[in-house]
């Protein structure tokens, strides 16, 4: 997979300090991100391919099911139009 994910032009990733959570701001919609989703999306800057993102997260979180879950998560967000 040579796709280098990046947020859609209309999407903005923000951290809500009051709630202590990350938010994905979209036109007419706000998505509250849970767990490490915000951290994963911060790596989606267009400079890394999916395998590079997986490798970086696998190193940061040994034993976590990164290789199985992250590509699936990114693909789902791409289908929603939140990543390109």
Descriptions of predicted regions:
Residues 1-42:
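Acidic, low-complexity/disordered tracts enriched in E/D and polar residues
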Residues 29-84:
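Long, charge-rich, low-complexity alpha-helical segments
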């Amino acid at each position: 997979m040579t796709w280098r994910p990046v947020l859609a032009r209309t999407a903005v990733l923000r951290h809500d300090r009051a709630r202590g959570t990350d938010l994905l701001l979209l036109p007419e919609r706000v998505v509250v991100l849970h767990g490490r989703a915000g951290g994963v999306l911060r790596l989606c800057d267009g400079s890394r391919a999916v395998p590079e993102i997986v490798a970086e997260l696998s190193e940061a979180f040994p034993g976590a099911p990164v290789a199985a879950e992250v590509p699936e998560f990114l693909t789902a967000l791409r289908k929603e139009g939140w990543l390109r």
